Amino acid sequence: MQYHVNGALVPEDEATVSVLDRGFMYGDAAFETLRVYGGDPFEWGAHRERLQHTAETLGFGDAVPEDLRKRVDETLAANDLADAYCKVSVSRGVQPGKLTPDPEVDPTVVVITKSLPRGGPDGERVWDDPAEVQTVRTRRIPSDALPADIKSHNYLNGILGRLELQRSAGDGDPADECLVRDIDGNVAEGATSNVFFVSEAGLRTPSADLDLLPGVTRDIVLELAREEGFPVETGAYSLDDVRNADEAFLTNSTWEIRPIGTVDGIEVGTGPMTKLLQRLYDERVERRHY
């Protein structure tokens, strides 16, 4: 494999970043994870826009290179990848070892790709089964403390949630995803996913006004549902709202749409709306990339 590091393609075992890089020292970096279908990054514009938003929030908006898409394409071509996982990172770069950043930024820009076959109607999903989801004590960091709508290299909030799953499982298999609440007790999101559920009133998902990261896949699902005329609501929901749902699923770029099998041991499962949204999502990918 070859990775793109600071404008050059390098072999995987030679791809390095300085120990003085602020992304390594402080998590002072922005990133995006996306899927590639048929050699073309899915929803590139939305991912590029969010990467820019994160960088601007962190104070180095000018550091995102204009030729970033070209670097992604070069990395895919160098590894002969058509269907792939891609991660793009932009850090503030190497600066003196102090917390206050220098205004002059020489960014570190890294593009990583690896094979990730498409699921779709005729393939196999990256997940094996519907997700087992478990509520954790870890709460979502309030946006007043750390903006929830950015993707920085500081991912400790999600890591702590996943660690809870491991510790609570003991010698058994941990749940696939944690269900994280905000400090007011509202359901927010998973460690790396957004949460949807279906009730008699229609499709529901926590509002972007809460402390959560509104994912690119989340936006697509909301768009597809509205195009189909489904009743859609975003709001503040309790754990019982999700536990008692008729259907529930998770979304992110890697999983796409993954049904939830259980929440805290309570069976929820998939259903007609989840299956239809999966099909509509697959059809959009097919139309745009194949």
Protein language model features and the residues they cover:
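N-proximal low-complexity "stem/linker" segments adjacent to membrane-targeting elements
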Residues: 62-64
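Active-site pocket-lining segments that scaffold enzyme catalytic pockets across diverse folds
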Residues: 66-122
